[in-house]
């Protein structure tokens, strides 16, 4: 059904209520999308657990669907509703899952091992109509964008309500490396096309600086910045590469404002991709940003309570874990790189 839909339709669409925890849909999309070079629209109706004992299923769902959001060739729009049904209840349900396309409805058994295929236009019309009704009684799971300008606008939404921010990135936050004016000067120099955003971004940064912040970054990402001038997050969009002089200035600023209560360097045993940025605001808004370069950005906002609570608990555990580099070691490493960069730039020996 998937192959025929992608192969035959100019703008293929697919509607489904397959379990969010199941790997079936991501697996076949990964195989088929590259073969045909088309973009498929997928609307996915997912049930989320209300029972806290099964909340891990909600996280499993997130684990399966986020790669779909980040994938080229897939316009993936998930919706959710709450249900007390668990996977233990599925064997008692009669063909509870379905896939709807322009030409087919495929009903699937609870274990997805067998199905009933319909091609009658009347059945297709009825299923499509009822699916739309279901969407009206559900909620979008996330907001997303793959357009840089739109992503920046979304990122700065409702920033005046921010009180607490916890983030995880490969490198420290821009505002930890430099004050606002220094950042804006670098933007004007390296990427003047983003100057129109700077007034709004300045107001945003002022709020960020007043919030209670808890930032995690990796030692591998930090070393990459110090040695090659390659940052992550917003600065990597507008400042392609920091010069040795800029790195010295930013590291001095970071060392001066460093606090082990708010800044946590994760040691080399913590594996984390350079392109991913995670931010939790006020414990009820989760931002996931995958930024390969200016042309390849995936931006997601999730405001579902069980997922946000799970990330809040994760960050609390991470702060007290064996992954945290002690403050004295972090300061020593920063000072070491300042001296190395001075020697490289000005010929100053330690």
Predicted segment positions?
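Hydrophobic protein-protein interaction segments
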Residues: 1-324, 337, 342
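Short, charged alpha-helical segments
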Residues: 329-332
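PLP-dependent class I/II
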Residues: 349-350
């Amino acid at each position: 059904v998937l192959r025929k839909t992608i192969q035959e339709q100019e703008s293929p669409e697919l509607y489904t209520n397959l379990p969010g925890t199941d790997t079936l849909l991501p697996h076949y999309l990964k195989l088929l999308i590259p073969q045909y070079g088309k973009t498929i629209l997928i609307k996915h109706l997912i049930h989320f657990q209300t029972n806290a004992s099964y909340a891990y299923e909600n996280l499993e769902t997130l684990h399966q669907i986020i790669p779909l959001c980040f994938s080229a060739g897939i316009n993936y729009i998930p919706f959710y509703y709450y249900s007390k049904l668990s996977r233990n209840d599925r064997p008692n349900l009669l063909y509870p899952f379905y896939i709807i396309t322009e030409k087919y409805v495929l009903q699937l058994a609870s274990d997805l091992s067998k199905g009933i295929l319909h091609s009658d236009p009347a059945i297709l019309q009825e299923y499509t109509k009822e699916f739309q009704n279901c969407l009206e009684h559900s909620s979008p799971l996330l907001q997303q964008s793959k357009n840089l300008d739109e992503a920046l606008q979304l990122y700065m939404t409702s920033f005046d309500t921010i009180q607490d921010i916890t983030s995880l990135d490969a490198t420290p936050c821009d505002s930890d490396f430099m004050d606002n004016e220094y950042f804006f000067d670098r933007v004007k120099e390296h990427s003047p096309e983003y100057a129109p955003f700077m007034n709004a971004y300045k107001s945003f940064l002022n709020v960020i600086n007043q919030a209670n912040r808890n930032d995690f970054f990796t030692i591998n990402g930090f070393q990459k910045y110090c040695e090659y001038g390659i940052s992550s997050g917003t600065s990597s969009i507008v400042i392609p590469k920091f010069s040795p002089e800029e790195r010295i200035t930013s590291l001095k600023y970071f060392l001066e404002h460093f606090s082990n209560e708010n800044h946590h360097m994760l040691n080399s045993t913590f594996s984390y991709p350079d392109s991913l940025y995670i931010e939790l605001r006020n414990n009820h808004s989760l931002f996931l940003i995958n930024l390969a370069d200016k042309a390849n950005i995936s931006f997601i906002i999730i405001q579902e309570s069980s997922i946000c609570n799970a990330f809040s608990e994760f960050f609390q555990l991470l702060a007290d874990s064996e992954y945290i580099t002690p403050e004295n070691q972090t300061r020593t490493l920063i000072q070491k790189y300042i001296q190395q960069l001075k020697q490289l730039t000005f010929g100053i020996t330690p």
